[in-house]
Amino acid sequence: MTANAQQLQFIKDSIETIPDYPKEGILFRDITTLLDNPAAYQATIDLLVEHYQGQGITKVVGTEARGFLFGAPVALRLGVGFVPVRKKGKLPRETLSETYDLEYGTDTLEIHKDSITDKDKVLMVDDLLATGGTIEATARLIRRLGGTVTEAAFIICLPDLGGIERLEKEGIHSFTLVNFPGH
């Protein structure tokens, strides 16, 4: 097993699975156990930075809230700015909004209007890719501000839920550290 393969297995093993949360039939992938393990958290950040080093990224965008936990340290290590995308009403300056569909209803994300320019090459970071709706809305915000979406990075992917294909249809390539079956 290579060093990277060992690190990826270590990261995967540090993520606890909680059955029937938040509702029956769901296998919840809990990253708080990864965050509580400094070696696993460090390995996660190291692998993301290693993958994106030298790609000309000028901004890292993290989607509320767990995207902040991984996006901010990656931005810091890459030496670029970090931009939070938040739920509606949480940002203090003038914002741009994007509404997207949830399983039952809709939600709205916002970004500061002055946070991305047409010169920016943007990496999006979130903890988990399921259906892809949240990160797709994040990409629309970035593109509406003129930024170029380079890729979306995730710690966890649930491939059975179709998020990778949804993002590919929108021209968004993704990079994931670990996959889990099911939902």
From Swiss-Prot:
Domain of life per record: Bacteria
Name assigned to this protein: Adenine phosphoribosyltransferase
Keywords for this protein: Cytoplasm, Glycosyltransferase, Purine salvage, Transferase
Any Gene Ontology biological process: AMP salvage
Coiled coil, from the record: none
Family, per entry: Belongs to the purine/pyrimidine phosphoribosyltransferase family.
Pathway of action: Purine metabolism; AMP biosynthesis via salvage pathway; AMP from adenine: step 1/1
Cellular localisation: Cytoplasm
GO cellular component, one term: cytoplasm
PANTHER family xrefs: ADENINE PHOSPHORIBOSYLTRANSFERASE
EC class (word): transferase
Single GO MF annotation: adenine binding
Subunit note: Homodimer.
Major subcellular location class: cytoplasm
Classification via PROSITE patterns: PUR_PYR_PR_TRANSFER
EC number: 2.4.2.7
Catalytic function, reaction form: AMP + diphosphate = 5-phospho-alpha-D-ribose 1-diphosphate + adenine
InterPro entries tied to this protein: Ade_phspho_trans (IPR005764), PRibTrfase_dom (IPR000836), PRTase-like (IPR029057), UPRTase/APRTase (IPR050054)
Gene that encodes the chain: apt
